[in-house]
């Protein structure tokens, strides 16, 4: 009896003591974190003191209204030459760069991708070419480069044309003589169709099979969720994010995306079990993207792990269709709003291709005016609006200003392409900026980034852009919808807040 009473009196005291200790430890942790925040912020302020910026809140940083990021960067381009700090919050700053000399210097270095900006993509696309750094990146880049040799790309032109024609046939069935259509979703299916056939040896048509729409939707969701997570201070922690509604949505989208790529890998492996197909592949002078991965041997002689294989497939599946879909959609919009240039392209294409029954690799170099218009559209609407680097060593820029190791530099291609000191009247669509006789800075136009880490598939992408523009202009006149003007917004690729609606007028 007395023993029970004794234990009863001690137990509440033990709880109280535990709570007191926990409170003290919590206060000490908060004090430590506060001191850490203060010291890191002081270091960042000193590190960026040579670069003026608009006023910011000490904790919340620069408050930018939702979907006003481009207006903000254009204001900075106008008021702060070459570069400007952007505080995401009190202890996180990045230097936005929009000057060609600055771009050339940073892209000529070997700084790694910014961990803060890119780590949130890892659960989705893994550590493939986009996220890898150092020697591993170099090995993978060298391994995959043959997939984009011109001998490999040549036969893809016909495949691209077939995919575009399927889309245009659908458009003819959907639209009347003069109807409005949201084009981005259709073009996304078409570019996914193309990449599945060219890079992943898939048969059939993505555009005619409804099951692929779930993958398209997953990519669209991850575009938004990844973008918003980077900018949310409360979602930096993986555990907290996993418990949030956005975290649950992201997990579901990751699963859908991975199911798609796993099926692609499984399907190709099954095809290669057939001895006839295997021998046909082995006799090829150049292998397709996925076959390179499946037959690859790293320098030590071992094959790629399943994890590394899927990371490269996930990376190129996304980058190989979504960026191109963005580029084509905005090119169509630019041509719709500049009818005189659209007609100039059409005349050039008609004289080259006639009715467009056939288009070949050699034709792609014979449409200079159309190429100029494509490049001008990519200048105004770059599919990838920015990339980030973490400085691995200090850097001094041509104007004498410098930054220390550890600072994140964001290369704003959108800011560069709209910089009036680089491109006079930057909002005016003028394809003659890209005429052969026009001169410009080597790093003033970077739709595919630059330096050693430029887009490995840039020639593939340019070919697809040309094929899509050529065949579409032979069958449709593109007209803007004045009631729904697209509003560009930055995501992982350039999107429109309200879709891209065009009036499609079938040509007789």
UniProtKB/Swiss-Prot annotation:
* Keyword annotations from UniProtKB, A to Z: Endoplasmic reticulum, Heme, Iron, Lipid metabolism, Membrane, Metal-binding, Microsome, Monooxygenase, Oxidoreductase, Phosphoprotein, Transmembrane, Transmembrane helix
Give Gene Ontology CC terms: endoplasmic reticulum membrane; intracellular membrane-bounded organelle
Q: Which residues carry this modification: Phosphoserine?
A: 438
Enzyme Commission number(s):
1.14.14.1
What regulates the activity here?
Activated by cytochrome b5 and phosphatidylserine.
Q: Where in the cell is it found?
A: Endoplasmic reticulum membrane; Microsome membrane
The UniProt entry, under InterPro entries, shows: Cyt_P450, Cyt_P450_CS, Cyt_P450_E_grp-I, Cyt_P450_sf, Cytochrome_P450_Monoox
The topology of this chain with respect to the membrane is: Multi-pass membrane protein
Tissue distribution of the protein: Expressed at proximal straight tubules and preglomerular arteries of the outer medulla as well in the cortex regions of kidney (at protein level).
- Cross-referenced Pfam families: p450 (PF00067)
Provide the cofactor list for this protein.
Answer: heme
Q: For heme, which residues are the binding ones?
A: 319, 455
Which family is annotated? Belongs to the cytochrome P450 family.
Function comment = A cytochrome P450 monooxygenase involved in the metabolism of fatty acids. Catalyzes predominantly the oxidation of the terminal carbon (omega-oxidation) of saturated and unsaturated fatty acids. May act as a major omega-hydroxylase for dodecanoic (lauric) acid in kidney. At preglomerular arteries, may participate in omega-hydroxylation of (5Z,8Z,11Z,14Z)-eicosatetraenoic acid (arachidonate) to 20-hydroxyeicosatetraenoic acid (20-HETE), a signaling molecule acting both as vasoconstrictive and natriuretic with overall effect on arterial blood pressure.
**Name of this chain's protein:** Cytochrome P450 4A12
Q: Which organism is it from?
A: Rattus norvegicus
Q: Which gene encodes it?
A: Cyp4a12
């Amino acid at each position: 009896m007395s023993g029970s009473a004794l234990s009863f009196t001690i137990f509440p005291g033990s709880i109280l003591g535990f709570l007191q200790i926990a409170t003290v430890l919590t206060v000490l942790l908060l004090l430590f974190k506060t001191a850490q925040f203060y010291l890191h912020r002081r270091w960042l302020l000193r590190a960026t003191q040579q670069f003026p910026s608009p006023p910011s809140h000490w904790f919340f940083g620069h408050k930018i209204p939702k979907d006003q990021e481009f207006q903000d960067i254009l204001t900075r381009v106008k008021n702060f030459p070459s570069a400007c700090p952007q505080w995401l919050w009190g202890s996180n700053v990045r230097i936005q760069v929009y000057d060609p000399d600055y771009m050339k210097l940073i892209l000529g270095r070997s700084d790694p991708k910014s961990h803060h900006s890119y780590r949130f993509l890892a659960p989705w696309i893994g550590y493939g070419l986009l996220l890898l750094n150092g020697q591993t990146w170099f090995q993978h880049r060298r391994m995959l480069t043959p997939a984009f040799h011109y001998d490999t790309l040549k036969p893809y032109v016909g495949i691209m044309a077939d995919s575009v024609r399927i889309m245009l046939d659908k458009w003819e069935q959907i639209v009347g003589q003069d109807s409005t259509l949201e084009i981005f979703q259709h073009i996304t299916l078409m570019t996914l169709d193309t990449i599945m056939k060219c890079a992943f040896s898939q048969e059939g048509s993505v555009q005619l099979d409804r099951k692929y729409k779930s993958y398209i939707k997953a990519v669209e969701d991850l575009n938004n969720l990844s973008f918003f997570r980077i900018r949310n201070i409360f979602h930096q922690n993986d555990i907290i994010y996993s418990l949030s509604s956005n975290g649950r949505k992201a997990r579901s989208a990751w699963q859908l995306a991975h199911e798609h790529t796993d099926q692609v890998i499984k399907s190709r492996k099954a095809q290669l079990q057939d001895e006839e197909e295997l021998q046909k592949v082995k006799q090829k002078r150049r292998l397709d993207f996925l076959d390179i991965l499946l037959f690859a041997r790293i320098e030590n002689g071992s094959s790629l792990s399943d994890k590394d294989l899927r990371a490269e497939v996930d990376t190129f599946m996304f980058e190989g269709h979504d960026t191109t879909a963005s580029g084509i959609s905005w090119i169509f919009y630019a041509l719709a709003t500049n009818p005189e240039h659209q007609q100039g392209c059409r005349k050039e294409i008609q004289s080259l291709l006639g009715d467009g029954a056939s288009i070949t690799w050699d034709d792609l170099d014979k449409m200079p005016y159309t190429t100029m218009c494509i490049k001008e559209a990519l200048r105004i609407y770059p599919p990838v609006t920015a990339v980030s680097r973490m400085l691995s060593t200090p850097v001094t820029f041509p104007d004498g200003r410098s930054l220390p190791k550890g600072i994140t530099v964001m290369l704003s291609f959108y800011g560069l392409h709209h910089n009036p000191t680089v491109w006079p009247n930057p909002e005016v669509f003028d394809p003659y900026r890209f005429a052969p006789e026009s001169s410009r800075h080597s790093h003033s136009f970077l739709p595919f980034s630059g330096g050693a880490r430029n887009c490995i598939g840039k020639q593939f992408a340019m070919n697809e852009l040309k094929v899509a523009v050529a065949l579409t202009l032979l069958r449709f006149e593109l007209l803007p919808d004045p009631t729904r003007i697209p509003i560009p917004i930055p995501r992982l690729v350039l999107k429109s807040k309200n879709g891209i609606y065009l009036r499609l007028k079938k040509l007789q």
